[in-house]
A protein has these predicted regions:
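Boundary/activation segment at the start of structured domains
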Residues: 1-99, 127
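Catalytic cores of nucleophile-dependent amide-cleaving enzymes
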Residues: 6, 97, 103-134
């Protein structure tokens, strides 16, 4: 068995400035959910376990971690990617969605669009097993 990495993301709030100045996305237990998944990965002896909670769960930090993992992992390695927080929809600009909407993760400082996540995950080498729980 290869290397096993995990990235657990949990947001109890978002920065209202990134969401039209009013909405803070308050949720009660998303940080706890991410902490619990991280504990599971630790208990299963994952080689690397990263946890991004609320203010550290920024677009840059998530994209940077995924890029780091894409360079480090190879065939027969595993990535567990967990997200607990709000999701959203925005207008599809590249016309690849039948419903004309892209789905998003609402990160602390802005939304991460499904196309961006797909592009990041496409950087992993063939044979890396990626499990996304969202």
């Amino acid at each position: 068995m290869g290397k096993k990495y995990s990235l657990s993301i949990g947001l109890n709030l978002v920065d209202p400035k990134a969401y039209d100045g009013e909405w803070d996305g308050a949720l009660a237990c998303c940080e706890k959910d991410a902490e619990d998944i991280n504990k599971v990965a630790v208990s299963l002896s994952y080689d690397k376990n990263d946890l991004l909670l609320t203010k550290s769960a920024t677009r840059n930090n998530v994209l940077k971690k995924l890029a780091e993992y894409a360079k480090a992992l190879s065939a027969d390695d595993y990535l567990l990617l967990y997200y607990s927080g709000h999701g959203g929809q925005v207008t599809d600009t590249n016309k690849d969605e039948d419903d004309n909407s892209d789905e998003t993760w609402c990160l602390y400082d802005g939304e991460l669009i499904d196309d961006e996540l797909y592009a990041c995950l496409s950087e992993f080498q063939p044979g890396v097993r990626i499990y996304v729980l969202s």
